[in-house]
């Protein structure tokens, strides 16, 4: 089994929620924040020694206080860039090997991460998906005849479902993804 490292993208301002704190610190019904649920799920799926890296920006001190044992990557342009540039910074700062990365606002069950372990262990890049009906806001996907992702974006027509915002990038694919993210505009989503 490969040592697992997880990156949480938490630099954004979350302006659509209209709250005075980062979106990952939104409280859930069980009393935890979204980020605390993510951290708990990561520990449950991968163990307590998992390297967790969090990309911070907006009100970064609040995120640092919420996850003091994490490694932090600062996106100093958080108010001018979207997630592609935060992910780029994170991948450049990551340790060798595969990276599980997720958006800081994803609420999920630990089983999602446990299912991705096979991809991690076999060196496969993967995205977690939901095959329910999708709307314009979601990141949608299509697949080719071999079942591999063909298209992945908010503008996909005829999407089979949505990418839920939890992904694995294999070590062998990391350099290519870094190159593509470097080519993206500041306002692009991944």
Task: Enumerate the language-model features and the residues they cover.
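Conserved N-terminal catalytic core of the sugar/cofactor nucleotidyltransferase
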Residues: 1-8, 32-99
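Glycine-rich N-terminal loop/short-helix segment of MobA-like nucleotidyltransferase
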Residues: 2-29
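Conserved beta-loop-beta/alpha segment of the NTase-like Rossmann-fold superfamily
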Residues: 63-139, 143
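Catalytic-core segments of class I nucleotidyltransferases/pyrophosphorylases
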Residues: 117, 148-190
């Amino acid at each position: 089994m490969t040592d697992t490292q997880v990156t949480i993208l938490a630099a954004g301002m979350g302006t659509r929620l209209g709250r005075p704190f980062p979106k990952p610190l939104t409280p859930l019904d069980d009393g935890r924040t979204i980020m605390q649920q993510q951290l708990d799920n990561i520990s449950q799926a991968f163990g307590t020694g998992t390297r967790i890296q969090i990309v911070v920006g907006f009100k970064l001190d609040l995120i640092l206080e919420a996850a003091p044992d994490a490694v932090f990557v600062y996106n100093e342009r958080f108010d001018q860039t979207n997630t592609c540039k935060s992910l780029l910074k994170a991948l450049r700062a990551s340790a060798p090997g595969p990276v599980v990365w997720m958006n800081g606002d994803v609420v999920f069950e630990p089983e999602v991460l446990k299912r991705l372990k096979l991809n991690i262990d076999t060196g496969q890049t993967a995205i977690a998906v939901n095959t329910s009906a999708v709307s314009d806001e979601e990141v949608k996907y299509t697949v080719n005849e071999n079942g591999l992702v063909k298209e992945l974006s908010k503008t996909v027509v005829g999407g089979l479902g949505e990418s839920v915002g939890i992904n694995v990038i294999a070590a062998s694919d990391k350099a290519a993804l870094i190159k593509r993210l470097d080519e993206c505009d500041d306002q692009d989503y991944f």
